[in-house]
Amino acid sequence: MAKKVAAIIKLQIPAGKATPAPPVGPALGQHGVNIMGFVKQYNEVTAAQAGLIIPVEITVYEDRSFTFVTKTPPAAVLLKKALGIETASGEPNKKKVGKLDRSKVREIAELKMPDLNAASVEAAMRMVEGTARSMGIEIVEG
């Protein structure tokens, strides 16, 4: 018989740097999950992606066991990494923070495809371009 799901917890944690401190500890502790067990497993799985924020979906079962699935980093994080900037524009319509060519947008869209609700890479590219525009990043042909 299948285990009963007690809760699904969604968190965004820096890759390889999960600690029992907030937000991880309290989120898992209230469901009775072995926090150190999760932290060790998460850090092992995400060690190769250091420097990125990785969303994770933790499924907690009634017997207090858990499984987790890591997702692709948020588009905003990938765009900032591609441009090498720390923060996006506070006023995206007035102040642009950089220019990104379409080939780089395609790379990011292809990386994000498994987590995006898009039928094609072109649709995923439009989603990534929308995120870029809202961050003050100009998309140029190239």
Curated annotation (Swiss-Prot):
InterPro entries linked to this entry: Ribosomal_uL11, Ribosomal_uL11_bac-typ, Ribosomal_uL11_C, Ribosomal_uL11_C_sf, Ribosomal_uL11_CS, Ribosomal_uL11_N, Ribosomal_uL11_N_sf
One GO MF term attached to the UniProt entry: structural constituent of ribosome
Keywords: Methylation, Ribonucleoprotein, Ribosomal protein, RNA-binding, rRNA-binding
Modification(s) after translation: One or more lysine residues are methylated.
PANTHER family, per the entry: 60S RIBOSOMAL PROTEIN L12, LARGE RIBOSOMAL SUBUNIT PROTEIN UL11M
Function: Forms part of the ribosomal stalk which helps the ribosome interact with GTP-bound translation factors.
Subunit and interaction comment: Part of the ribosomal stalk of the 50S ribosomal subunit. Interacts with L10 and the large rRNA to form the base of the stalk. L10 forms an elongated spine to which L12 dimers bind in a sequential fashion forming a multimeric L10(L12)X complex.
Similarity remark: Belongs to the universal ribosomal protein uL11 family.
Protein name as it appears in the record: Large ribosomal subunit protein uL11
